[in-house]
C-alpha cells in the first residue's frame, strides 16, 4: 500500500514525533511505501501573527504541496497525525477532492478542547468537552491567551460545522478506551473511533521476577505528573534516572 503520512512536528521533539517515526519504520518494514509529509513549528518564526492565524485555519502551502505529492506518489491512504497549526485542516479538503481516504490519529485532545491536554490552571478539566467553546475562550485555556484560544476554538468550530469529522475523515485512531469515550462525548462519531495503543520496539523478554520499584517514562513537566513521581520517589531506597533532552 502507498501511504502518505502527514505530521506537523513540534518545536521541541516529543512523544508524538517519536511515535510517528516509529510507525513509519514499522510500515516500511512490512513492505508498505511511505511518503512522509512534515512541517515544523520552527517555521512559525518567519510568519507574522496574522499569517500564522490564517495558516492555522487553511494553509495554501499545504494544499499546494499535497497536490504535488499526489501527482508524484498517488497515495492509497493518508495517515494524518498532528496537523496544528501549519498543515491545518486543508489536508482534509484536499484529500476529499482527490478522493483519498484519511485516517487520523488523535495523540491529544485538541479536537475537543483547544488546550489539548484537558488541563485548566494545572488541574484536570473536562467540563468544556462537547460544548460550545465560549467557556474555553473566556478562561483563555490555550496558552492563557484570549486571541490564541479564540483562534483555535474558531478552527475547531468551523471543522465541526463543515462536517469534517463526519465527511472528510474515514477513521480516527485513539490510544485507549477512555480517550474513545471522551472524543465521542466531544462530538466525534463513535463508530469511527478505533483503539490502537502506542508501542515500543524491543526484542527483549520482560523479566517479572524479583523486581522492585516503578518506572516513569515521559517528559519531566507538571502536566505529566512530576509531583506524583517526586512523592513516590521519596519512598524508594534506590533510584536511577536516564533520559534525553
Segments and roles (model prediction):
Residues 1-42, 71-73, 94, 98-101:
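N-terminal subdomain of nucleotide-sugar transferases
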Residues 5, 67-87, 101-110:
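Short N-terminal targeting/anchoring amphipathic segment
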Residues 39-68, 73, 80-82, 142-153:
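A short, charged, and often flexible helix/loop element on the N-terminal side
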Residues 40-41, 217, 238-245:
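Glycosyltransferase donor-sugar binding loop
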Residues 104, 168-177:
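A short beta-strand/loop micro-motif in the catalytic core of glycosyltransferases
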